[in-house]
Amino acid sequence: MVDANAFIDEAIADIKLKVGNGKALIALSGGVDSSVCAILAHRALGDRLIPVYVDTGLMRKGETDRIREIFKFMNPHVVDASDRFFNALKGVTDPEAKRKIVGEMFIRVFEDVVKGLEVDFLIQGTIYPDRIESEGGIKSHHNVGGLPSVTEFKGIIEPLQDLYKDEVREVARALPLPEEISERMPFPGPGLSVRVIGEVTREKIAVVREANAIVEQELVHQFKPWQCLAALLEKGTGVKGDNRCHGWIIAVRAVESRDAMTANHMELPWETLNKISSRITSEIPSVARVVYDITPKPPATIEFE
């Protein structure tokens, strides 16, 4: 396990050394990884840190307002780039291609933000499992294998690249960060795009965003999963009232894990699963069916794409 206090001192010193008298951009997402990086970088660089949150249109319900509130002391740049992301993802169905497109779009948006500001470095919250999955060919993470090979930044700084998620949480507690951040569930960098099987559209994202909100409301506080989510699969036949319908299929997933390298499904009570199914199909009229995924990792990954 990591010595959190020693790590904090070393990370701050390393950021100072690498950036020197220059400036750096920190990519905020609201998750524990980027939040820890943001605090470390802010302590190292102060006003020479440019915090940026990109609203991709692929985020969780209420996420942008939450970011504004939590990081208001940093006065972050909030960029609505949703049109750019949806346009770039139009017609794309391959999961790996989606991840690479999202990674490239993030970099291009960051480059636009810092034009004329003489910012040489990008700081991001890559952690060890991200590197393992990307380098091992399992899936490209938007902040590793999904990054373009050519960028305007002179260097990318990844203070957490050798830490597992549970170690990042230890650092978060030592900083200290509020529990709502230090204990927050992982959320994929490419956002809800990897919870939509096939082409990403605004309609599909709206459906899966509401479904994810319901799943989190029903599971997070009571059962404390490592991660829980809803993914949109395809359409299937259902019945609404006395009429046949052709609606979306939503897959619910909740897992237990320590480091995200392996995971097992949570054995949730039937009444909880029934409530989730009932809420999703009644509150989202375009959904016809809800299923629960019990596949461990391996052979499955935690996310669907």
Swiss-Prot record:
The keyword Nucleotide-binding applies. Residues 2-184 form the GMPS ATP-PPase domain. It comes from the Archaea. InterPro entries: GMP_synth_C (IPR001674), GMP_synthase_B (IPR026598), GMPS_ATP_PPase_dom (IPR025777), Rossmann-like_a/b/a_fold (IPR014729). Pfam families: GMP_synt_C. ATP binds at S29, G30, G31, V32, D33, S34, S35. GO terms for molecular function: ATP binding; GMP synthase activity. The keyword Ligase applies. Keywords: ATP-binding, GMP biosynthesis, Ligase, Nucleotide-binding, Purine biosynthesis. It catalyses: XMP + L-glutamine + ATP + H2O = GMP + L-glutamate + AMP + diphosphate + 2 H(+). Pathway: Purine metabolism; GMP biosynthesis; GMP from XMP (L-Gln route): step 1/1. Catalyzes the synthesis of GMP from XMP. HAMAP family: GMP_synthase_B. Heterodimer composed of a glutamine amidotransferase subunit (A) and a GMP-binding subunit (B). This is GMP synthase [glutamine-hydrolyzing] subunit B. It comes from Methanocella arvoryzae (strain DSM 22066 / NBRC 105507 / MRE50).
